[in-house]
UniProtKB/Swiss-Prot annotation:
Function: Polycomb group (PcG) protein. Catalytic subunit of the prc2/eed-ezh2 complex, which methylates 'Lys-9' and 'Lys-27' of histone H3, leading to transcriptional repression of the affected target gene. May repress transcription of the egr2 and en2 genes. May regulate the circadian clock via histone methylation at the promoter of the circadian genes.
Major subcellular location class: nucleus
Lineage: Eukaryota, Metazoa, Chordata, Craniata, Vertebrata
Domain CXC: 505-607
Protein name per its UniProtKB record: Histone-lysine N-methyltransferase EZH2
Comp. bias regions, Basic and acidic residues: 200-220, 376-387
Record PROSITE patterns: CXC, SET
Record field: compositional bias (Acidic residues): 184-199
Region (Disordered) location: 184-220, 342-428
Oligomeric and partner information: Component of the prc2/eed-ezh2 complex.
Length: 748
C-alpha cells in the first residue's frame, strides 16, 4: 500500500497540482514585485521633485519680483464692463476691465494618426486590444455590435483570462521551480538504489571528469514537467515544443551567449573560420533586396541569394602578373586557374593556338590541369575580348622575345597593380597562418572573384596573391563548387527577345480579360535552374517575373522593360501599358535610370519610386471635415502623391472595416486581392482627400519595382489652391451615408 501511495504522488494529477500551485505563487510574487517596483519608482520620482522644488524656491528667494499693477477701469469708454475680485482675507479688492471675445468656429474633428512617407506592413491583430467607444446612439441602434465584434476576434480581448497568461519569463521560472520537485524525487530513488550502485563506484571515480562536463545535461528538467505544463496550458504547444522553447530561452540567458545561427564579428577578436554560407547568413536574412536596405518594414519575406552571376567584367582577370611575386609566375598556377574557370562555365578548356609564357610541353602537361588561354577563361560577354585573336601571333612573338628578361622594378608587393613580365617561379609554398577572419573573408570573396586571386589579395589586405592562391589550392576539397554558368546557348538578341515577350504578353492579356479584377501580390519565384512553366508561382498568379526572381534572365515570363526614347506617358510604352513604372535597372534609354537627384527626368513614368510629389496643404473642407489643397499648378495625368498607410490583409481589413463603418470614417484602400492599405492609424496627407462623383484626381494601383503602390494623379489641369477630390467608388447608398454634401461643379 505504501508503494502504491508513493506512485500516486508522482502521477500526472500530482504534477498538475504542482504546476497550478507554483504558477499561482509566481503570479502572486510577480504582482508583489511589480507593486514594489512601482512604489520604489514613485518614491524616487517624488524625491527628485522635492529636490527640484527646493532648488527653485531658493532661486525665487534671490530674485527681485516686480509687483503687479492693478489696472484701473476707464469709465469714459462705452460698453466697458468691470470685473471685481474680492477675498474674505485682508487682500485688497481687484477691479479689471472685462473684454468679451468673439465667437470662433471650432475645427473639424480629427483622430490621431502617425505620418508616413512609405507603406508599412503590419501583422494581423488576432486579439481585440480595446473595445471601441461608439456612443450611446450607436449602441441603441445596434446593441449586438460589440458582441459581433468580439466574435470576429474569436472572443479574444486584451486583458481577459488573466489567470491563463504565461510569458517566457514566467515559463522559465515555473520550470525551474518544478525542477526542484523532480530533483527531490530523483534523490529518493537514488537512496533506494544505493546498494545496487556500490559496485560501480570505482568506475564512476575514473569518469569523474566526464561527469562534471556532462552535469548540465543531466540537470535538464524532467519530461514530466513539460507534460504537466502542456496539459495546463494547451495553447502553448506540446511537451516537445515546450522543451525546445526552454532550451532556447535558457541558452539566451547564458552570459556571452550568441543568438542561434550567429557568427562572431569578422572584425572582432573572436572571429571564427566558417564557410561562406554561414558568414553571409545575417546578410541574406536581414537584407531586403527589393528595398536595398536592412530591417525592411515592407516585405515580410526575403528572397534567397541569386544564383545567377551578373554578366559584367568587374571580376575578370586580365592575365597579367601584378608584381614580381605574383602567383601567376608559379609553375602550374595558370593551369589551375584555367581549370577552375572551365569547370565553372561547363565547357572543356581549349588549348591555345600559339605558345605562351609558362606553358608546359605537350608531353608533360597533366590531363587534370590542361592549359587554357586566359582570354578564353574570362566572361563570355567581355568587351575586351574582341581583339584577342587578331593580334595573337604578334603577341606570342613578343612574349617569346621577352621570356628571359627580368624586371628592373624593385616592387616587392604582390598586390601592386602594375603588370610586370617575370620568369616562372618554382619556389616551395609558403607556410603562412590564416586567422579565422582572413579565412572567412576569403571564402566570401571566392564566390564573387573566382580565380582572380590578385583582386582577392587586395581586398583582404594582409595576404599576398601567392598566399591566397596556395590557400585556394589547399581548400579545393572544402569550398563548395560554384554553380556552373549556362553559356552553351548564346543570349537572344534584344529584338527577338522583345518579339517573344510581346507574344507572351498577348497570351497573358487574353487570360486577364476574363478576370481583370484579379490582381495578386507578387512574390519572387524560387526554382533555380528550372523554367517558369505552369507550376511557377508567378505564372499561376498571372504576374510577370521580376529582377528579384531566381529564374534565368532569358525567362520568357520576365518583364524586359521598355526601350522608349520619349516620356513613357502613352500606351506605346510597354511599361505604361502594363500599369507599371519604368524600372531603372531594365529601362535604360527612357531616362528612368538617370541620376536619382536629378529633378528634370525625361521619363514621366517613374514618379512614385522617386517620390516626386506635390506640395499639399491641410485645411478645413467645405464638403466634409478636413480637406487637402494643392499648392502647385498641376497638368493633366501628372503625379500628385502616393497614398501611403499600413498594409494589412483582407481579413484584417474586414475586421477593421466594421469599426470604421460605425464611425462613418474609413481610410481603407484595396491594393490587390491579398492586401489593403489602411491610412487610419498611419498615413500621409493625401488621406484627407474627400470623395466626389466629379473628381479632379484619380487613383491608380501600379507595379513599382515588384510592389503594388497607389498613386494619385490629376484627372484634369488643377490650379493652385484647389481642393483635391477623387472617387472612392462608393455605392449609391454608401455615398449618401458617408458624404452628405457634394461640391459645386467648377467650370474649368
Amino acid at each position: 500500500m505504501g508503494q502504491t501511495g508513493k506512485k500516486s504522488e508522482k502521477g500526472p494529477v500530482c504534477w498538475r497540482k504542482r504546476v497550478k500551485s507554483e504558477y499561482m505563487a509566481l503570479r502572486q510574487l510577480k504582482k508583489f514585485r511589480r507593486a514594489d517596483e512601482v512604489k520604489s519608482m514613485f518614491n524616487t520620482n517624488r524625491q527628485k521633485i522635492m529636490e527640484r522644488t527646493e532648488i527653485l524656491n531658493q532661486e525665487w528667494k534671490q530674485r527681485r519680483i516686480q509687483p503687479v499693477h492693478i489696472m484701473t477701469t476707464v469709465s469714459s469708454l462705452r460698453g466697458t464692463r468691470e470685473c471685481s475680485v474680492t477675498s474674505d482675507l485682508d487682500f485688497p479688492k481687484q477691479v479689471i476691465p472685462l473684454k468679451t471675445l468673439t465667437a470662433v468656429a471650432s475645427v473639424p474633428i480629427m483622430y490621431s494618426w502617425s505620418p508616413l512617407q512609405q507603406n508599412f506592413m503590419v501583422e494581423d491583430e488576432t486579439v481585440l486590444h480595446n473595445i471601441p467607444y461608439m456612443g450611446d446612439e450607436v449602441l441603441d441602434q445596434d446593441g449586438t455590435f460589440i458582441e459581433e465584434l468580439i466574435k470576429n476576434y474569436d472572443g479574444k480581448v486584451h486583458g481577459d483570462r488573466e489567470c491563463g497568461f504565461i510569458n517566457d519569463e514566467i515559463f522559465v521560472e515555473l520550470v525551474n521551480a518544478l525542477a526542484q520537485y523532480s530533483d527531490y524525487e530523483d534523490d529518493e530513488d537514488g537512496d533506494d538504489n544505493q546498494d545496487d550502485e556500490q559496485d560501480d563506484t570505482a568506475k564512476d571515480q575514473d569518469d569523474n571528469m566526464e561527469d562534471k562536463e556532462t552535469q548540465p545535461l543531466r540537470k535538464f528538467p524532467s519530461d514530466k514537467i513539460f507534460e504537466a505544463i502542456s496539459s495546463m496550458f494547451p495553447d502553448k504547444g506540446t511537451s516537445e515544443e515546450l522543451k525546445e522553447k526552454y532550451k532556447e530561452l535558457t541558452e539566451q540567458q547564458l552570459p556571452g551567449a550568441l543568438p542561434p545561427e550567429c557568427t562572431p564579428n569578422i572584425d572582432g577578436p573572436n572571429a571564427k573560420s566558417v564557410q561562406r554560407e554561414q558568414s553571409l547568413h545575417s546578410f541574406h536574412t536581414l537584407f531586403c533586396r527589393p528595398c536595398f536596405k536592412y530591417d525592411c518594414f515592407l516585405h515580410p519575406f526575403h528572397a534567397t541569394p541569386n544564383t545567377y552571376k551578373r554578366k559584367n567584367n568587374e571580376a575578370a582577370n586580365d592575365g597579367k602578373p601584378c608584381g614580381p611575386h605574383c602567383y601567376q609566375l608559379l609553375e602550374g598556377a595558370r593551369e589551375f586557374a584555367a581549370a577552375l574557370t572551365a569547370e565553372r562555365i561547363k565547357t572543356p578548356p581549349k588549348r591555345p593556338s600559339g605558345r605562351r609564357r609558362g606553358r608546359l610541353p605537350n608531353n608533360t602537361s597533366r590531363p587534370s590541369t590542361p592549359t587554357v588561354n586566359v582570354s578564353e577563361a574570362k566572361d563570355t560577354d567581355s568587351d575586351r575580348e574582341a581583339g584577342t585573336e587578331t593580334g595573337g601571333e604578334s603577341n606570342d612573338k613578343e612574349e617569346e622575345e621577352k621570356k628571359d628578361e627580368t624586371s628592373s622594378s624593385s616592387e616587392a608587393n604582390s598586390r601592386c597593380q602594375t603588370p610586370i613580365k617575370m620568369k616562372p617561379n618554382i619556389e616551395p609554398p609558403e607556410n603562412v597562418e590564416w586567422s579565422g577572419a582572413e579565412a572567412s573573408l576569403f571564402r566570401v570573396l571566392i564566390g564573387t572573384y573566382y580565380d582572380n586571386f590578385c583582386a582577392i589579395a587586395r581586398l583582404i589586405g594582409t595576404k599576398t596573391c601567392r598566399q591566397v592562391y596556395e590557400f585556394r589550392v589547399k581548400e579545393s576539397s572544402i569550398i563548395s563548387p560554384v554553380i556552373a554558368e549556362d553559356v552553351d546557348t548564346p543570349p537572344r538578341k534584344k529584338k527577338r527577345k522583345h518579339r517573344l515577350w510581346a507574344a507572351h504578353c498577348r497570351k497573358i492579356q487574353l487570360k486577364k480579360d476574363g478576370s481583370s479584377n484579379h490582381v495578386y501580390n507578387y512574390q519572387p519565384c524560387d526554382h533555380p535552374r528550372q523554367p517558369c512553366d505552369s507550376s511557377c508561382p508567378c505564372v499561376i498568379a498571372q504576374n510577370f517575373c521580376e529582377k528579384f526572381c531566381q529564374c534565368s534572365s532569358e525567362c520568357q515570363n520576365r518583364f524586359p522593360g521598355c526601350r522608349c526614347k520619349a516620356q513613357c506617358n502613352t500606351k506605346q510604352c510597354p511599361c505604361y501599358l502594363a500599369v507599371r513604372e519604368c524600372d531603372p535597372d531594365l529601362c535604360l534609354t527612357c531616362g528612368a535610370a538617370d541620376h536619382w537627384d536629378s529633378k528634370n527626368v525625361s521619363c514621366k513614368n517613374c514618379s512614385i519610386q522617386r517620390g516626386s510629389k506635390k506640395h499639399l496643404l491641410l485645411a478645413p473642407s467645405d464638403v466634409a471635415g478636413w480637406g487637402i489643397f494643392i499648392n502647385d499648378t498641376v497638368q493633366k495625368n501628372e503625379f500628385i502623391s502616393e497614398y501611403c498607410g499600413e498594409i494589412i490583409s483582407q481579413d484584417e481589413a474586414d475586421r477593421r472595416g466594421k469599426v470604421y463603418d460605425k464611425y462613418m470614417c474609413s481610410f481603407l484602400f484595396n491594393l490587390n486581392n491579398d492586401f489593403v492599405v489602411d491610412a487610419t492609424r498611419k498615413g500621409n496627407k493625401i488621406r484627407f482627400a474627400n470623395h466626389s462623383v466629379n473628381p479632379n484626381c484619380y487613383a491608380k494601383v501600379m507595379m513599382v519595382n515588384g510592389d503594388h503602390r497607389i498613386g494619385i494623379f490629376a484627372k484634369r489641369a488643377i490650379q493652385t489652391g484647389e481642393e483635391l477630390f477623387f472617387d472612392y467608388r462608393y455605392s449609391q447608398a454608401d455615398a449618401l451615408k458617408y458624404v452628405g454634401i457634394e461640391r459645386e461643379m467648377e467650370i474649368p
